[in-house]
Amino acid sequence: MTEIIDLDLVDDFIKKPMVKQQKNQSSKPRVKRRGQLTFDDFRNIKIVEEPVVLSHNSSIDESLDAATQNTKKREKYEGTCDEEMKTKEMEANMASKYSNIKTHSNDTNKVESISEHTTSNNRPLNTLNWSPNIPLRYSDFAKFMSDETVTESNWAPPLCTPLPYAGDVMKILSFIVKFKWVFSDDLLNLSFQDVEIGLELKVAGHSAKNIRICQDKMNLLFCSLLRLLFCSEKRADNQTHRNFTLKRFLSLKNPYGKLVGKLRSLIQEWGLPKEWRGNSDILSTLNFNGGGLLTMEPLDRIILLRCMIDWNCSYSALFHNEIQRLTHLKGDTGFNHQTFHASRFAMCGANNILDSCEVLCSLMSQKLENRKKRKPSDKGKLSKINSQMKFLKGVRKSLSEKVTTDRLRAAVKINEEWGEYFANEFTHTPIDDPTVDEIYKLRTSEFMIARIPRVGDFYLPPFWIGNECSSVNTSYSFNDMSTYLNYFVKFKEEGTKILPAKTAQNENKCQLKLIYRNTPACIRNLQFNDVHFAEVPHWFEVAGDSNSLSNFIEYLESLSSLTENDTDDTKKGIDNLIEFLKIFSIFINETIQRITAAPTGSTEGRHLRTSSQRRTTVHYSSDVNGDVSEESENEVDIDVSDDYDSEYLSEENTLTRKGEDRTDKSFGKRELHNGAKDCDRNCDDIEIFSEPVRQLQDNSREKRSLRRNARKGL
């Protein structure tokens, strides 16, 4: 064929003509570019079966493992040496030896997961839960959901009073604990009874002074949450909110300001709770004449505080930034699931902690032996491995003691030295304090002490011990790890049948709240029952003082003896709860003895403050939509009489042993003046001044002088 030479295509450097082919000349088939599919493309499609490795319930890593499992199975077993086989047998025997350390059927802390196919890298050592907390899973009660009678049929404690607001009260107390750096010291020692009395949910049997103090604290809590909710972005990182104390709150003329009106305008946008959806004007009377929470019904008060916590978590810049920080911490919780969790020593007992520590040391020593067999070239690494193995050898010898108290002392001592040898191996051990690391802070159930399958959950919120003259708030002292371990040693040394709380003096009261939640019935009603969830009680009080606590312990002992199977999870949960409550009884007895031996001072009662009777010395504004809360000392007119000063500060002076002369002085004044002066105290500013005077500005000099002259006339 004749070739056609195109002179325009000649290369300038080589001077060699290039051949240009004609259109009808044969060439290579053109490859189609990627684009829209045509019918020709569909003709080439072949139908194949779905591969096993691409199942919907497996992740990418699981699919890759399944694909390579068959190809590497023969190579894996052929390359296994005799020494590694011995290691596998030792780990399997160890798993059967310590198989009793699991608490629930679905707990991640199961040593039985060590199988015969464990490789030499000791993967189960990192997958098991060695943290001081254990997760609270739904699967703990899942197998009981098919039963109509979820709870044990013989579960009938001597005291089981329905307490529908218990969950909301513990939510408030838990929120204060998690974000205690923004609240004042007056709110950090709140107990369950303080919230219950301050919101008038239960006021029977309490003095007028105690009721009024609790009411002031609840108004302080509401005002603090209101200020934090509308905190600006500039002040989001400022920790000056702790300066908003109870004394400062009571001295302000209008502590709420425009914040209540702003809350009313946004509540429709944020959404109402289900209890208020039939009455959208529930907040119309809030802060009427400066009354705060006391202008609402008792049940509406607890609902409002619960909603304030939810709104702060969602819309407050201060709490939003803190939650963002706590949820993005570097570290591992140990169980790799974002769920609620509770402390191990309360839920499982000391024996579980000691067994877990022993298993951890055994597996860690085996891992170090495998490292040593690889003969590291660096002499520094070899010496480090030898020192670690020597330390673990002494640890295992100490934990092999038969006496539980000796094992516990050894475990505490070992935990102090653990970080020096294994700083990069594990971040947590079972004997650690569960409240130290911030990674557990956000989802910790602080007051939970037991979970019993087929029965439910048990909580011990903050309480106080004392009498009218002196009281000690034991809010969080017993839940401390070191405190619990010290009393556990005393309990083991003194005997297991000690119930000293019954022999305590009658004048020293222990007003605790042991709360029981029927969790199995709660889950079942949420899933299968058509009955309205709020109409069925799920929260109960099973102990309210020392005597009822002793009766409940005796009932649990009789209930535990009915179960013949010692391996049952229900029996294990009951035994752990009995042990915890007996140790708690020793703590109560020693605290009461310490209060009885301490000298007490005389204090005076205070008048009850209700929605219709408010003190004159705190100048609440009648204008709800007034100026924003005034906190400057030169702008606020603080006119506090000597009677009120001694009356309010009597509790603080008793605790600090100061101001006794002031208390005696006020007591003498009240003896001289009879009912005439007491009636005048109950008058408000609105009743004192006429309408033209009330129309003046609150900050005007003329109105302040008229106010002072009017009180002098009274």
From Swiss-Prot:
Transmembrane segments: none
Keywords: Cytoplasm, Nucleus, Repressor, Transcription, Transcription regulation
GO biological process, one term: sister chromatid cohesion
Composition skew (Basic residues), residue ranges: 704-714
Region of interest (Disordered), ranges: 598-674, 694-714
Compositional bias ranges of the Polar residues kind: 610-624
Compositionally biased intervals (Acidic residues): 628-650
GO cellular component terms listed in the entry, alphabetical order: cytoplasm; nucleus
Basic and acidic residues: compositionally biased ranges: 654-674
Entry keyword annotation includes Membrane: no
Subcellular localization(s) per the UniProt record: Cytoplasm; Nucleus
Keyword Mitochondrion belongs to the record: no
Main location group: cytoplasm
Described purpose of this protein according to its UniProt entry: Involved in HMR and telomere silencing via the recruitment or stabilizing of the SIR (silent information regulators) complex.
Other comment: Present with 432 molecules/cell in log phase SD medium.
Assembly mode: Interacts with GAL11 and SIR2.
Protein's name in the database: Protein ESC8
Species of origin: Saccharomyces cerevisiae (strain ATCC 204508 / S288c) (Baker's yeast)
